[in-house]
Amino acid sequence: MLLALGNKDLEELNKINIDILKASKEFTTIEIANAIMTAFTPKDNFLNVASKYESTVEDLKSAAQVNNWCNLKTHGKIAKILEELDPNTVMILLNAIYFKGTWQKEFPQNATSTKAFYNLNEESKSVKIDMMSIKERFNYYEDKELQIVELPYTKDSMSAIIILPNKDTNINDFIKELDDEKLQKLLKRMYNEIVNLELPKFELEFSSLLNDVLIKMGMDEPFNQVTADFTGMKDLNDIYIEIVIQKTYLKVDEKGTEAADVTSVVINTKSIPIEFSMTVDRPFLFMLRNKNLPQNYEMVFMSKIEHL
């Protein structure tokens, strides 16, 4: 499991998670909640660790109980995550993140118009969407591969990061090459520029099984009935992870969203500021960033928008 999480040692990962939980208490726009619903009584050591991460522990009774928790913690945005509860299920681990932010610079509502968006693998045709538009100063960077812009929210040092690969690049190929080191370099290359930005207005809800993703990351043992080892929470080693479900709701509108370096100073005559244009009319990445968190862990939400 540690291999899947980037070879961090357990103590370091625990410290990072606690730092994130502490920081989230200061947020007014983002809420983080954890819960454990179990059909057996876990070991005391496990319960102590759960308490450290402010995770509630409840008796597992029904799918309705799980869905009610999700509905409450996401303010009604995710009302159901389970259709039914398998009789063999003995534990469910739950994590919920809820975010609602207002743009520091709101998009003018009268500037929103109907425009084309080209979905992934459907480039020959387009769908009509509401496209928001704004001309403002934002942190921005572009090169031959991509455009990246940062839109700040009004509170909590939160901002949205939007990365748009160039038209000739498949977004899935782009993501394969986008590691944390490259992302940090992109963030550092952004400068305050005048940007003519067009961004889709959208509301999405999507659900996915994460089993295959986690197994490919090296976290295969917990899913295997033979190799899974959860003796840290239960004396009898007779449990394993069956499924990991992620369900996400995302809304973006005009008001917001529910190393060597050389510096050269050149003095020249004043000129008209350069303006950049960024039209997000094809698949893109949407991230939520909190600058108060450790550098490699400041992205609290990451999503790929393929279809609108």
Regions found by a protein language model. Give the residues of each.
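Primarily short, surface-exposed interaction patches in extracytoplasmic proteins
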Residues: 1-8, 49
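Non-catalytic, conformational "gating/processing" segments within enzyme and secreted inhibitor domains
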Residues: 13-168, 188-271, 275
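Feature captures eukaryotic membrane-trafficking machinery centered on endolysosomal pathways
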Residues: 150-152, 273-308
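Short Gly/aromatic-enriched secondary-structure transition segments
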Residues: 2-5, 107-116, 173-181
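Extracytoplasmic/secreted cell-surface and envelope-processing proteins
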Residues: 1, 170-172, 206-208, 260, ...
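C-terminal, non-catalytic macromolecule-binding modules
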Residues: 180-183, 214
